[in-house]
Amino acid sequence: GTLEIEGNFLGEEKITAIIEGKRVLGTVKELAEVQGAIKAYEKLDEFRYSELADLLLAHKILMDEILTTAGSFRSVNVKVGEHIAPKPSIVNELMINLFSWLKNSDEHMLLKSCIFHYEFEFIHPFSDGNGRIGRLWQSVILNSFNPIFSLLPTESIVRDYQEEYYKAIEDSTQLAESTPFIEFMLEMILKSIQNIIFLCFH
């Protein structure tokens, strides 16, 4: 799901084949994206949600075959749609502050995961892979709260509501606060839970 959001269309059948070690046809970039995502999601239980070093490692694993700067913050300015991300010179400080908040905040973990996801996308700390790593890290945070969340296909739900996902980010940026994005992501988490319940009883 998270790869399709970013425009990788290998599809479930080919991705399953890659997991099983079979050869599949696809561009080098598509295959590298899938292999990186598989490796990163396999380590979901090992990542410590409040450790910046673990997020950098996750980015390296996710993007290693795609990006020469995988695992390092960007050194260039970036613009995403109408959003101009913070200057690269302050990215490290912003990320340290974000992780300090993540570690010390008394907010409920569901809220923390959504707030972190939005703030991470606002900072846009990497030159590529920000969407993927932001969604992965929200899963890491939720999984640390309750392992049941590792079973929830939140990324697949977001994929199905992709337009609304980007609009929620845009609305939060325009308002200079994360409420629209938090509400959207909580709704996606609820839909994921409802899907699991439906599958269990049907």
Task: Please give the residue ranges for each predicted region.
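FIC/Doc superfamily catalytic core
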Residues: 1-202
